[in-house]
Structures are given as structure tokens and as C-alpha cells.
């Protein structure tokens, strides 16, 4: 994507962001994890990395003042923006009408907490592209992947440490419950690093891009809830062997060992060495 690609969508400059925030009486809050992107080059980069197509319907969580929304609209069929702050949600259509009038019809705004939504209006989203609030990034991604089976792919900007965890593989230092759970839904990879200076206010941490590609869940007789219960138990005491960590889940250490052996997993191993298919097998053998 080049400058000309967004010729009909005038992207927000740092001055635009501060002006809009002042007009709305917005002071970014840590409670909502608000850090607004002020660099047009960064939002172009996100759209490029997201590999969206003209057929994609994008769900964007936390559009804020509209920096990424404006960059997305010329390149996709539709954007459903989910915004928890009523002031920002109310202002976004006007910002799009001013900066990208040719694409204003492609936008729908839903005023809601993304963690609490139970449905979205049609057309159903095929892609998740968002600068996610740091404090809810992992729960939001997992909730939307579970809620919206239509989601085929996505790209999210999150805290660098969260990006590392989401993309970690079994055996990696950062591998944990989020890594295992997201693997139930998608293949995940790091897609780049983002510096602090592209945000206002400047955060205390760096950010990273994470790309997602939907894939089938592991073949298993166990439900997602049952598998995730094993994951949670395994990582609640990650320094312990699985025999010990899963003792409460199974009812006793002996029962945990029996379930692990039935699943073909060494009871002396730790959760950080297992993939999501391993956790699914263990769930199938719960006493």
C-alpha cells in the first residue's frame, strides 16, 4: 500500500488526533488501555500486514479516534468497529465522513465492551484487525475467535510481551496458557515490532504485531471448555510436574498420573512442553 492507495481517505496526523481528542474532551486513560496511534505510516503498515482483501469484512476492536479505521476502509468491503467509550463511538462516523466520505457507507459502529458482545450485525466478519487495549488483548482475541466462526484471519497490535506469548511454541520461554488456547483456533506468528513513539500518550512498553490464520480445532471428543480447563490447571502451577499440577483437576495425583499415561503423556513433564492436541488428549481421559 502506498500514499496513493489512501487518496480518498485522509489519514489522521498527530495534530488531528490531538485536536479530535480535545474536541471530545478525551484524555486517554490507562483503565481502558487507551493509546492512540498518531503515525499514518504505522496504520498503513498494519493494513498491509493484515493482508485484507476487497471481500473482507473486518471487525476492529477499540477504533478510538479512527486512525486505523480510516486506513482500513478503502481496502475492505466493510468495517464493524466495536468501541466501549460512548464518546468515541458517537464521534467515529463523523470523522470518517470528514476524512473518507467515499467509504463512509462501509462503516458500522457498535458501542459495546468487546468482551461482553454475544453477536455482531451482518455482514459477519472475516478478519480481525485491531490495535487492542493492552489490558484485555488476550481475552478479546480468544472471545472473538470463539464467538465468530466466520473469522478466517487477523492481525492485532498488542504489547510486545503479549505478542511473544501468543506466538510462542511449546518449549519456548514465553509459552503459556494464552499460547496453548489460541492454538485451538488458529496458527499464530509474529508479524513485526512497533516502537513506542507512534502512540499518544507514549506507553511504557513496546508493541508487536501478531498475525492469525484460522485452522480446525484438534480432533477430539473433549469440549473446548474441558480442554481449556486442563490448560489452566497445567499452567496455574507451571513449575510443577503435570502429575502434581493436575491433581486437583483429576481429583488426586494418582488419578492425574493415570489420565496422563492414558493420554500418552509423561506424568513428569510440564505443561510448557505440550501442544494443544496433547491437552485435548488429556481432557479425554479425565477420571
UniProtKB/Swiss-Prot annotation:
* SMART domains from the UniProt entry: rADc
Task: State the reactions this protein catalyses.
Answer: adenosine(1518)/adenosine(1519) in 16S rRNA + 4 S-adenosyl-L-methionine = N(6)-dimethyladenosine(1518)/N(6)-dimethyladenosine(1519) in 16S rRNA + 4 S-adenosyl-L-homocysteine + 4 H(+)
Binding-site residues, S-adenosyl-L-methionine = 35, 37, 62, 83, 113, 131
Q: What does the entry list under GO cellular component?
A: cytosol
Name this polypeptide is given: Ribosomal RNA small subunit methyltransferase A
Q: Which InterPro entries match?
A: KsgA/Erm, rRNA_Ade_diMease-like_C, rRNA_Ade_Mease_Trfase_CS, rRNA_Ade_methylase_Trfase_N, rRNA_adenine_dimethylase, SAM-dependent_MTases_sf
Supply the source organism for this entry.
Thermobifida fusca (strain YX)
This chain is encoded by the gene named rsmA
Q: What residue ranges carry the coiled-coil annotation?
A: none
Question: Which Gene3D superfamilies does the record associate with it?
Answer: Ribosomal RNA adenine dimethylase-like, domain 2, Vaccinia Virus protein VP39
Amino acid at each position: 500500500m502506498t500514499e496513493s492507495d489512501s487518496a480518498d481517505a485522509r489519514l489522521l496526523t498527530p495534530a488531528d488526533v490531538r485536536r479530535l481528542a480535545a474536541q471530545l474532551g478525551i484524555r486517554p486513560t490507562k483503565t481502558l488501555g487507551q493509546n492512540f496511534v498518531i503515525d499514518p505510516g504505522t496504520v498503513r503498515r498494519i493494513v498491509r500486514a493484515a493482508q485484507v482483501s476487497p471481500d473482507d469484512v473486518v471487525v476492529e476492536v477499540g477504533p478510538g479516534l479512527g486512525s486505523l479505521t480510516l486506513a482500513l476502509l478503502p481496502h475492505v468491503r466493510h468495517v464493524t468497529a466495536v468501541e466501549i467509550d460512548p464518546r468515541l463511538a458517537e464521534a467515529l462516523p463523523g470523522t470518517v465522513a470528514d476524512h473518507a466520505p467515499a467509504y463512509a457507507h462501509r462503516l458500522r459502529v457498535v458501542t459495546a465492551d468487546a468482551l461482553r458482545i454475544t453477536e455482531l450485525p451482518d455482514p459477519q466478519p472475516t478478519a480481525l484487525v485491531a490495535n487492542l487495549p493492552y489490558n484485555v488483548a488476550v481475552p478479546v482475541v480468544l472471545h472473538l475467535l470463539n464467538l465468530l466462526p466466520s473469522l478466517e484471519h487477523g492481525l492485532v497490535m498488542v504489547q510486545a510481551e503479549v505478542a511473544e506469548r501468543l506466538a510462542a511454541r511449546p518449549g519456548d520461554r514465553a509459552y503459556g496458557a494464552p499460547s496453548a488456547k489460541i492454538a485451538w483456533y488458529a496458527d499464530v506468528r509474529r508479524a513485526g515490532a512497533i516502537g513506542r513513539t507512534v502512540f499518544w500518550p507514549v506507553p511504557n512498553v513496546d508493541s508487536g504485531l501478531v498475525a492469525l490464520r484460522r485452522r480446525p480445532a484438534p480432533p477430539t471428543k473433549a469440549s473446548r471448555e474441558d480442554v481449556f480447563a486442563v490448560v489452566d490447571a497445567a499452567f496455574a502451577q507451571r513449575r510443577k510436574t503435570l502429575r502434581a499440577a493436575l491433581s486437583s483437576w483429576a481429583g488426586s495425583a494418582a488419578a492425574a498420573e493415570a489420565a496422563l499415561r492414558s493420554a500418552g503423556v509423561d506424568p513428569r513433564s510440564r505443561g510448557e512442553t505440550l501442544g494443544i492436541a496433547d491437552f485435548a488428549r488429556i481432557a479425554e481421559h479425565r477420571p
